């Protein structure tokens, strides 16, 4: 790993090489990952218009390796969590390739202005600060924002999906959110929730857990037909009202994209861990999506949405438990009660009766907070 002083030298050299040596740098902090961001400001004068840019810093070799195409389950297990889950391991080449593909579809990912994936640095178009989450907190009418977000998903789901994404000299495979990745997703819960809430799952509980999830995973992999952003929620969407159609939604944090079931990103949007999406908003958004896709079997799709939504919520519960207990980030505990509310709504689907019964038996009410 590059030491901080060495990293700063590398960052300054990168900026100078690509014509950004004279900018003012403003730290924007990081997120739950190993990335950090800065806003670069150019002074406004006769030669410059005072533009701003985003500087992304993802140090190489910080995370475990991503999943090579064709890797066996055993090889993925040996490589670690990112390979099991088919995450991009923060690789800048994944971001560059995904951004280029998204923009080519007429969507609004940040344009990549300069990048060196080998050292994990990139300068990006600045899409501004109008995150969905921030705007909604001000009391703005959220309906147009969610309608546009659904339109963005419809555009994504209508786009042809290549095996490999390519842009600006960077390539990245669009892998399937397969059985092993989905199993890794729901098993985060049984690994980390016991440490967070002092639970114990015996062999019988774990055997029942696997039997319940196997057919749901099969649904997820069999239905993996669309480009999946994988983190499509209000903290990663920027409102760009001056643009048209689906391009009004600025997209961030999409480098972990996979080929997945279309219900997955709907769950990310409507089961938002960081802000409450009302049942009315959820219903209106689902209706907008289904109205635009009359070829779908409505009943079957909603069943898939509830099942894969439950898997997604349980995955996030496990991730937040890990962030709190392993990584010392207690603020993520504040989001957990909201996730349990979403999960109870999914449990209302009779097809998930066995999953609901498992939680009723092994996760008492006092642990669901």
Tell where the protein language model's regions lie, with residue ranges.
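Short secondary-structure junctions
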Residues: 15-23, 105-107, 295-297
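Active-site acidic catalytic loop and adjacent metal/ATP-binding pocket
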Residues: 34-41, 54-55, 156, 213-264, ...
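ATP-binding pocket architecture of kinase catalytic cores
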Residues: 42-184, 195, 221-222
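ATP/Mg2+ or Mg2+-diphosphate-binding catalytic cores
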Residues: 318-369
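ATP-binding glycine-rich phosphate-binding loop
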Residues: 20-43
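Juxta-kinase regulatory segment immediately upstream of eukaryotic protein kinase catalytic domains
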Residues: 1-24
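Active-site catalytic-loop/activation-segment of kinase and kinase-like phosphoryl-transfer enzymes
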Residues: 172-216
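Active-site activation/catalytic loop segments of kinase-like enzymes and analogous catalytic loops
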Residues: 187-197, 259-296, 310-327, 339-347
């Amino acid at each position: 790993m590059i030491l901080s002083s060495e990293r700063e030298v590398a960052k300054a050299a990168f900026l100078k090489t690509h014509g950004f040596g004279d900018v003012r740098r403003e730290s924007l902090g990081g997120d739950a990952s190993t990335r950090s961001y800065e806003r670069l400001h150019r002074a406004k004068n006769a030669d410059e218009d005072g533009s701003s840019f985003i500087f992304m810093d993802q140090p190489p070799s910080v995370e475990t390796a991503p999943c090579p195409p064709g890797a066996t389950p055993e090889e993925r297990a040996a490589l670690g969590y990112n390979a099991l889950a088919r995450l991009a391991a923060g690789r800048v080449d994944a971001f560059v390739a995904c951004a280029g593909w998204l923009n080519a579809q007429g969507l609004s990912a940040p344009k990549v202005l300069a990048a060196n994936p080998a050292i994990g640095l990139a300068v990006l178009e600045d899409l501004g600060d109008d995150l969905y989450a921030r705007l909604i907190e001000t009391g703005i009418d959220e309906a147009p924002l969610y309608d546009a977000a659904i339109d963005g998903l419809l555009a994504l789901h209508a786009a042809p999906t290549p095996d490999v994404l390519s842009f600006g000299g960077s390539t990245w495979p669009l892998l399937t959110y397969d059985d092993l990745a989905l199993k890794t997703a729901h098993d985060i819960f049984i690994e980390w929730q016991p440490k967070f809430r002092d639970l114990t799952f015996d062999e019988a509980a774990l055997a029942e857990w696997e039997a319940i999830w196997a057919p749901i995973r099969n649904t997820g992999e069999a239905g993996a037909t669309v480009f999946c952003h994988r983190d499509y929620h209000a903290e990663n969407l920027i409102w760009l009202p001056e643009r048209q159609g689906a391009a009004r939604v600025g997209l961030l944090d999409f480098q972990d994209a996979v080929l997945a079931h279309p219900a997955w990103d709907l769950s990310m949007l409507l089961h938002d861990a960081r802000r409450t999406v009302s049942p009315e908003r959820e219903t209106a958004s689902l209706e907008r999506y289904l109205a635009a896709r009359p070829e779908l079997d409505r009943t079957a799709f909603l069943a898939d949405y509830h099942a894969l939504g439950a898997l997604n919520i349980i995955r996030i519960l496990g991730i937040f438990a890990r962030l709190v207990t392993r990584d010392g980030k207690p603020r993520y505990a504040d989001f957990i009660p909201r996730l349990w509310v979403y999960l109870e709504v999914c449990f209302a689907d009779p097809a998930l009766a066995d999953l609901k019964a498992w939680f009723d038996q092994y996760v008492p009410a006092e642990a669901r907070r």
